[in-house]
Amino acid sequence: MVAALALASCAGIGTVSQEEVTSEAQRRGGGITTHLVDAAVEAVAEETGRDPLPVHSIFATLAQVTITVPSADGSPGRDVWSYGTSGLYGGRGLTGPAVAGESAAGTFAVATGDLDVDAAGATARDAGGPGTWVESVTIARPGEGAEPVLSVVVTDGATSQTIAVEGSR
């Protein structure tokens, strides 16, 4: 009887829609929002004592942000910080730094309020067409000396496309 109940409750796992997952992440304080990215930038800046924060890249998914910054000890390596707001897709709060290898890309300064992820997501969803949702957001320099680019990956569940969003920084 217990096994049948467990099996019956597992049968519903595959029927959860992306909208339900996104709604649940938002309810728990997550989602890919300007607020989430600002909270992550603020947490790393506070922990490292750097404001504005020198950044190699920022990668945001549902309720989780990963920020790569120059190593705090001045070595050519990078420190990788993770910030999550939801138990649904990872831990709560700030974790790190994990040490990564050297980076060829230069840094750019980011302070709370510098990035409008909400507007970039809306622009990308419009470009992606009906029924698309934001899967991830990346902010990085495409090369040394280049301006940072905000790229948004949108999907309809079957296919994904990356859209570079102008003027989001």
Per-segment meaning from a language model:
Residues 11-14:
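Bacterial signal peptide processing site
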Residues 87-135:
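Long, charged/polar, surface-exposed segments that mediate recognition or autoinhibition
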